[in-house]
């Protein structure tokens, strides 16, 4: 069993021109012995966004704090806030944005892309 505290978690800033104001934390991952799933936290600063993207695996998201917007396959914006849970099917294009001034935090659980095939 692995139990981690906030002090154990490293924060990285993804280096990609399609990302703005986003911090990423791997809460549980392969370094912890989890070969099949990865749990990550994203912190999106006010005015920030993740890239619009899709992938060939499903994943679930839990909004921890703040308010944001999820943009779907068709470009529709869906407001989300603390307590909301999302299911994103495989190959569905999506993007998270924070049009507000306060940070927007969410946890994302995915299949390990290296072992999901």
Residue ranges and their predicted role:
Residues 50-52, 70-71, 88, 94-100:
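Short beta-strand His + acidic residue motifs that chelate non-heme Fe in jelly-roll/DSBH
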Residues 43-45, 55-70:
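Short, conserved beta-strand element in jelly-roll/cupin
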Residues 1-36:
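A short, N-terminal "cap"/entry segment at the start of jelly-roll beta-barrel domains
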Residues 74-90:
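Short acidic-glycine-tyrosine-enriched beta hairpin
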Residues 82, 90-115:
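Ligand-binding loop in jelly-roll beta-barrel domains
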Residues 40-55, 90:
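Conserved short histidine dyad/triad with adjacent acidic residue
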């Amino acid at each position: 069993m692995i139990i981690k505290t906030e002090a154990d978690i490293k924060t990285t800033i993804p280096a990609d021109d399609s990302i703005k104001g986003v911090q990423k934390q791997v809460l549980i991952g392969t370094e912890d012995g989890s070969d099949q799933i990865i749990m990550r936290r994203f912190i999106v600063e006010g005015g920030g966004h993740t890239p619009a993207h899709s992938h060939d695996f499903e994943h679930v998201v839990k909004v921890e704090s703040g308010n944001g917007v999820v943009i779907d396959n068709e470009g529709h914006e869906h407001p989300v806030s603390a307590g909301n849970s999302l299911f994103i099917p495989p190959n569905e294009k999506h993007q998270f944005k924070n049009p507000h001034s306060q940070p927007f935090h969410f946890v994302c659980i995915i299949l390990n892309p290296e072992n999901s095939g």
